[in-house]
Swiss-Prot record:
UniProt protein name: Light-independent protochlorophyllide reductase subunit N
Compartments, record wording: Plastid, Chloroplast
Record-listed [4Fe-4S] cluster binding positions: C22, C47, C107
Gene source species: Chlorokybus atmophyticus (Soil alga)
Pathway(s) where this gene product acts: Porphyrin-containing compound metabolism; chlorophyll biosynthesis (light-independent)
Length: 478
């Protein structure tokens, strides 16, 4: 295969893979992330069935999302969409009183041309609650792009340059307050420890640099970890998009630097640059110890900060992963393509000693992922392994033929193809599991390898029992 002997990354494009989750599944993690929100999905029974099945595990938690089910009367324009949505939003306000209501458009609202953007401001004015419209429908390339659509819509609601100027004034006044407090303590002859306890951490812990906003939905502990990693380099994170509460959205505007933590947020990055005039830091994504180090180093270089202790920290993490690395070294992996995390995961697994045959990916924004692609190429060269072929919108039939030829030790695939591949002797891992797992930062690399090695460890256990085939002979010939 030509791509396997190439000295540079090879890009191909096939007919398209749409065997993936629907983007409205972003509701699953976003409603938990934004604690004062309510998500209203406007779609058909099919959307409702999908949400019930995909999110059914949270049925006892009284979730903050609901389904506005379109009926025949809605589609044939016999019912007034405005009145129906206003009634639902009024009911949501009475029952939950959220800080924001997010309307999630679906394929049906696109097809029947519902003017959600036109109705939202009028209803918002009447019920006095912000309404954000996000068209997270199945016409996207990958289900993770649902989050991209929601965050891009929320960018429009972020405070602007007025808030930024207020923050800079507050910063100056806090310094004055600190100096006056310090003088007061010296007058009262308090001991040094008491004076140190009142010292604002910002005055000592951070250098003076432009505001930095990070975008991408991550669990609270991971947000704290990444914020702390930058704090160790004396860099302050001004805010996260999305924030834990809608009322705490970060201020964005001219002079603000933004950096993404996920590879599927290209639309959000574009909106931040073009409409809010922010400056994008093009960094690899903080997935795995190597990616996290490169991410921090890139941010440091933009703010002219010399990174401290990153190499030692990365090496220490790799030492702690040695038990997993022994299982994956020399093994091969094939990405069928599902969630746009493929390039970052392939780069990390290459660093772990695996050989990546192919990276299938539903959609590739080469500008947004430029730094990640460069790091992948550099990693392959340093590890002395062939460059993988990158196939955008892969054709599943052709992929199956390539998998049969290559016989990889592991295929990372969508759920639709997992069982058929297992029946043909190919070990698989669901790609959707990487979406819901904590994979960002230095300390979560173990979670990635736990997912990757599980099918490999299962195979070793089955071989120990003498079970080398999960399917009877003769079944595969049918």
């Amino acid at each position: 295969m030509s791509a396997m002997t190439s000295d540079t990354l090879t890009f191909e494009c096939e007919t398209g893979n749409y065997h993936t989750f629907c983007p409205i599944s972003c509701v699953a993690w976003l409603y938990q992330k934004i604690e004062d929100s309510f998500f209203l999905v406007i779609g058909t029974k099919t959307c409702g069935y999908f949400l019930q099945n995909a999110l059914g595990v949270m049925i006892f938690a009284e979730p903050r999302y609901a389904m506005a089910e379109l009926e025949e009367g809605d589609i044939s324009a016999q019912l007034n969409d405005y009145q129906e949505l206003k009634r639902l939003c009024t009911q949501i306000k009475q029952d939950r009183n959220p800080s924001v209501i997010v309307w999630i458009g679906t394929c049906t609202t696109e097809i029947i041309k519902m003017d959600l953007e036109g109705m939202a401001p009028k209803i918002e004015q009447e019920i006095k609650i912000p309404i954000v419209v996000a068209r997270a429908n199945g016409l996207d390339y990958a289900f993770t792009q649902g989050e991209d659509t929601v965050l891009a819509a929320m960018v429009e609601r972020c405070p602007g340059e007025t808030k930024l100027s207020e923050q800079s004034q507050d910063k100056g006044s806090s310094k004055q307050n600190f100096s006056s407090t310090k003088g007061l303590f010296s007058i009262l002859n308090f001991n040094k420890k008491a004076a140190a306890d009142t010292q604002p951490q910002e005055a000592e812990d951070y250098i003076d640099h432009p505001p930095l906003v990070l975008f991408g939905s991550l669990p609270g502990p991971v947000v704290s970890q990444l914020t702390l990693e930058l704090k160790r380099q004396k860099i302050k994170v001004s805010g996260w998009l999305p924030s834990q509460r809608y009322t705490d959205l970060p201020a964005v505007g001219k002079g603000v630097y933004v950096c993404g933590v996920n590879p599927f947020l290209s639309r959000t990055a574009t909106i931040l640059m073009r409409r809010r005039k922010c400056k994008l830091i093009g960094a690899p994504f903080p997935i795995g110890p190597d990616g996290t180090r490169a991410w921090v180093e890139k941010i440091c270089s933009v703010f002219n900060v010399e990174p401290i202790g990153l190499a030692e920290r990365e090496n220490k993490i790799w030492e702690g992963l040695e038990d997993y690395l022994q299982l994956v070294r020399g093994k091969s992996v094939f990405f069928m393509g599902d969630n746009l995390l493929e390039v970052s995961l392939a780069r990390f697994l290459t660093r772990c000693g695996m050989i990546v045959y192919e990276i299938g990916i539903p959609y590739m924004d080469k500008r947004y992922q430029a730094a990640e692609l460069a790091l992948l190429e550099k990693t392959c060269q340093e590890m002395g392994v062939p460059m993988p072929r990158i196939v955008e919108k892969p054709d599943n039939y052709n992929q199956i033929q390539r998998i049969r030829e290559l016989q990889p030790d592991l295929a990372i695939t969508g759920m639709a193809h997992a069982n058929p591949l297992e029946a043909r002797g190919i070990s698989t891992k669901w790609s959707v599991e990487f979406t819901f797992a904590q994979i960002h930062g230095f300390t979560n690399a173990r979670d990635i390898l736990e997912l990757v090695t599980r099918p490999l460890r299962r195979n070793n256990s089955l071989e120990g029992l003498g079970w080398t085939s999960l399917v009877k002979e003769g079944v595969l010939s049918n």
